[in-house]
């Protein structure tokens, strides 16, 4: 069951309708034992998106207090924080659901679509459309590509690749995800470099593997369209160890 609070209280039906139909942005996190990974990065994301989308700052300490209030005694959960346009000042909705992990491995189908304002985490129906279309075709998710075939991200996660010496992130409009940011730091400390480069769908078969990463974790990618990818590699092993070493922060 999902627990929802808006500005610290259960919403009235009209408030809930306003929340799901209003202009805004959000962040998503997994909570374990009352902690989450990259809490400062989540607050920074919300602050930056709020200034760009809604024109005002956002008090990160208040957001954290609202998350703690919505969690109550719940220690493990999937949490989303939505900030949306409302009379006076932006409203903050926190949703609390059962904890979740990303299914692995993942099979992806390419879809020609580019999220508008891709650097902001916002809700669009188009992403869900392409994800459902891929699932109807026997895949787990869709990988978003521009008309020239340049890869950006999946509908729900960042995608990365291995080229034998480094982790390659797509050089394309995309969300700089929290898990991606955490991995970049951990990989650098472990001596595995990461870089941005243009990746086209036709190039994927020549790479040494691929993975998805989001708040729900990391998953190897075994298939993109008709192409099979290796899933046993030193890169994936290093990636898993790096992710496991990321500290959990008190909310």
Language model regions located:
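Short secondary-structure junctions
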Residues: 71-78, 137
């Amino acid at each position: 069951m999902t627990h929802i609070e808006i500005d610290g209280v259960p919403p009235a039906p009209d408030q809930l309708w306003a929340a799901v139909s209003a202009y805004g942005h959000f962040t998503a996190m997994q909570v374990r034992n009352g902690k989450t990974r990259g809490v400062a990065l989540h607050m920074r994301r919300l602050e930056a998106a709020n200034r760009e989308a809604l024109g005002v700052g956002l008090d990160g300490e208040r957001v954290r207090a609202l998350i703690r209030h919505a969690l109550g005694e719940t220690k493990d959960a999937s949490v989303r924080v939505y900030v949306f346009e409302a009379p006076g000042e932006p409203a903050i909705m926190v949703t609390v659901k059962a904890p979740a992990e990303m299914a692995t491995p993942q099979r992806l189908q390419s879809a020609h679509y580019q999220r508008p304002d891709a650097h902001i985490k916002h809700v669009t129906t188009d992403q869900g459309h392409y994800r459902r279309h891929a699932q109807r075709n026997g895949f787990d998710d869709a990988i978003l590509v521009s008309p020239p075939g340049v890869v950006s991200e999946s509908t729900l996660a960042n995608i990365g690749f291995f080229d034998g010496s480094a982790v390659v992130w797509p050089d394309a409009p995309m969300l700089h995800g929290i898990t991606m940011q955490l991995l970049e730091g951990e990989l650098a400390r472990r001596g595995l470099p990461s870089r941005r480069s243009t990746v086209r769908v036709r190039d994927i078969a020549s790479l040494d593997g691929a993975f998805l990463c989001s708040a729900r974790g990391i998953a190897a990618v075994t298939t993109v369209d008709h192409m099979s990818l290796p899933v046993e590699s030193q890169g994936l092993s290093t990636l898993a160890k790096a992710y496991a070493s990321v500290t959990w922060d008190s909310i």
